[in-house]
Amino acid sequence: MKPVKQDAVKLLDIFDPEMASLLHREEKRQFETIGLIASENVASPLSTCLEGSVFTNKNTEGYPGKRFVGGCELADQAELLALERVKKVFGAEHANIQSGNATIANCAVLTGLLERGDTFLGLTLDNGGHLSHGAKFHYSGREFNALHYGVNRETERIDMDQVRQMALEHHPKLIVTGASSYPRMIDYAGFRSICDEVGAYFWVDCCLLYTSP
């Protein structure tokens, strides 16, 4: 296979030098900067190669074996391969890799598990939580009764006593843990225990920070 990406960049230099300049400057900025934003991990060149490949041209609406258009045989194989790998990494029975981004995936989880107005608990935004975990201005905070736990100011870790107290008081249908700017290890076992105690779904949003499987 030809070095398609390099050829494309060369063409961009010729046909759209303004955009090419921005691309080169952004690449330089990224490789000269230490970024601490969890959602901005440097993507593997293997991933960017596939994202910019001919698979981008293919309409794959639907699921493997149940597409709405023809010619998806190889795309089906690629999706099934990715699904099996995800399930193996996380020891999961099921997986879905079709979401365009994490926030859309989060909305799908909430819509699938909750009814409008149901109560759920999440980490407050100003303590490192994510806006899709019930921020008032977000869909998740408008459609559902989102309540928030926080961080213990002395330990700077999620206040598990507060989580349990709120769970016992409000009996949420779901408790989510995960964050956009909380760099500590999360006590998943502690959350699991609290969810079991109150009969809540336990949702781990690990798209931004998660220990290597």
What are these regions (language model features)?
Residues 2-66:
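N-terminal "arm"/small-domain region of PLP-dependent enzymes with the aminotransferase-like
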Residues 114-129:
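Conserved PLP-anchoring active-site segment centered on the Schiff-base-forming lysine
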Residues 132-177:
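PLP-dependent aminotransferase-class I/II
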Residues 176-199:
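Active-site core of PLP-dependent enzymes with the aminotransferase class I/II
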Residues 210-213:
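Conserved small/polar residues in nucleotide/adenosyl-binding loops
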